């Protein structure tokens, strides 16, 4: 078992990484003494883990569960409203707790419900995907709007994050790719040694188990925890965590949510941001080396066919980092050192045109 403590201005809490913790959740929740518990999960996770979690919480407090469809489309206003209604109908009060049992979609949605129900109640993140190692830490919770991803949300830190690496045994290949993108991102922005470690040890997702899984999770989460501790509300440094997300979110929105996983889109965004970095800083980055490794792991690294430069730029202008209509990118000066920088729209347009043209020829 490993425990990492996250320090923020609003809350201090632990991230516990422990095999078998799903069947022991009750022992972590009991000291918090919730008046009632609402588990929010999706249909795929429910089939695998809901009964285990329920058994662990048995007799702790009145227990309820809502099972939603799996997929990015679930992170909608309709489901947010339905969960608020369920919480009211179940009689949750301000001492009640929500448990987010699932991946990033469930964590974001359930966390936003917790942030706003009766002006805020406690919640615990129980991630069941690799992607959620990133989204479960830091307190950013949100739902999507048809005009943009994560546009309606809040900052609301969990009481705890309980992570059972045994869940990796049930992850499909695409979920591995979605989650590993955020791991790579953490190395690129702040920890060159971790990035080198990943390239050395992860040549197949089946390697992510046992001690390697635990080290990967802890080192990746530590990067995020350090940034969140310094900038909880994303006034500055925390925006570095958006490497690859400016274009990545635009690709997700333009293709339609669910057509490409978040991590698959972020990888394309990372490669684009690194190419943009080379043009801005006039120095080379190990892009070919990164692309070769990512392709070996099954990623597509080019902008999907059918997307239009103008539409992508229009969507990027809705990005939360935009200031006074100017697109701001997270760029790399070198591996392990990221910066936030305003980028001339014409330069973005020219590089997008080149990338899209190369993909169609």
Curated annotation (Swiss-Prot):
Q: Name one Pfam family in it.
A: DHQ_synthase
Q: Which UniProt keywords apply?
A: Amino-acid biosynthesis, Aromatic amino acid biosynthesis, Cobalt, Cytoplasm, Lyase, Metal-binding, NAD, Nucleotide-binding, Zinc
Q: Which GO terms describe its biological process?
A: amino acid biosynthetic process; aromatic amino acid family biosynthetic process; chorismate biosynthetic process
What is the first-listed, main subcellular location in coarse terms? cytoplasm
Q: Which residues make up the binding site for Zn(2+)?
A: 182, 245, 262
Subcellular location(s) per record:
Cytoplasm
Where along this sequence does the record place binding of NAD(+)?
A: 104-108, 128-129, 140, 149
Cofactor: how bound: Binds 1 divalent metal cation per subunit. Can use either Co(2+) or Zn(2+).
Give Gene Ontology CC terms. cytoplasm
* UniProt catalytic activity: 7-phospho-2-dehydro-3-deoxy-D-arabino-heptonate = 3-dehydroquinate + phosphate
Pathway in which this enzyme or protein is active? Metabolic intermediate biosynthesis; chorismate biosynthesis; chorismate from D-erythrose 4-phosphate and phosphoenolpyruvate: step 2/7
Cofactors: NAD(+); Co(2+); Zn(2+)
According to its UniProt record, the EC number is 4.2.3.4
A GO molecular function held by the record: 3-dehydroquinate synthase activity
Write out the function statement from the record.
Catalyzes the conversion of 3-deoxy-D-arabino-heptulosonate 7-phosphate (DAHP) to dehydroquinate (DHQ).
NCBIfam families assigned to the protein according to its UniProt record, in alphabetical order: aroB
Family assignment from sequence similarity: Belongs to the sugar phosphate cyclases superfamily. Dehydroquinate synthase family.
- Name the chain's protein: 3-dehydroquinate synthase
| Source organism of this protein record | Halalkalibacterium halodurans (strain ATCC BAA-125 / DSM 18197 / FERM 7344 / JCM 9153 / C-125)
């Amino acid at each position: 078992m490993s425990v990492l403590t996250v320090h923020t201005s609003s809350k201090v809490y632990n991230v516990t990484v422990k095999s078998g913790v799903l069947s022991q959740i009750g022992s972590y929740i009991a000291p918090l003494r919730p008046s009632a518990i609402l588990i929010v999960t999706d249909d795929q996770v429910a089939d695998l883990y809901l009964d285990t979690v329920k058994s662990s919480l048995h007799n702790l407090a009145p227990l309820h569960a809502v099972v939603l469809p799996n997929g990015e489309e679930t992170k909608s206003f309709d489901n947010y409203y339905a969960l608020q209604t369920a919480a009211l109908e179940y009689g949750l009060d301000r001492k009640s707790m929500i448990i987010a049992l699932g991946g990033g979609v469930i964590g974001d949605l359930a966390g936003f419900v917790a942030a706003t129900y009766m002006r805020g109640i406690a919640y615990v993140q129980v991630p069941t995907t690799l992607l959620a190692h990133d989204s479960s830490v830091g307190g950013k919770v949100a739902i999507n709007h048809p005009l943009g991803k994560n546009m309606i949300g809040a900052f609301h830190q969990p009481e705890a994050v309980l992570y059972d690496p045994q869940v990796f045994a049930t992850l499909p290949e695409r979920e591995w790719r979605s989650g590993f993108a955020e791991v790579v991102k953490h190395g690129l922005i702040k920890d060159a040694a971790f990035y080198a470690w990943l390239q050395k040890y992860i040549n197949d997702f089946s390697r992510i188990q046992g001690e390697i899984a635990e080290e990967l999770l802890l080192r990746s989460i530590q990067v995020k925890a350090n940034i969140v501790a310094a900038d909880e509300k994303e006034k500055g440094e925390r925006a570095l965590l958006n490497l690859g997300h400016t274009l990545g979110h635009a690709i997700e929105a333009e293709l339609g949510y669910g057509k490409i996983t978040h991590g698959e889109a972020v990888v394309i965004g990372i490669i684009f941001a690194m190419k943009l970095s080379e043009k801005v800083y006039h120095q080379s980055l190990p892009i070919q080396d990164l692309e070769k490794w990512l392709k070996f792991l099954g990623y597509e690294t080019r902008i999907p066919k059918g997307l239009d430069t103008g539409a992508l730029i229009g969507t990027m202008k809705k990005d939360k980092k935009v200031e006074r209509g100017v697109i701001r990118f997270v760029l790399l000066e070198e591996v392990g050192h990221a910066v936030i920088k305003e980028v001339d729209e014409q330069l973005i347009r020219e590089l997008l045109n080149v990338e899209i043209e190369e993909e169609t020829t």
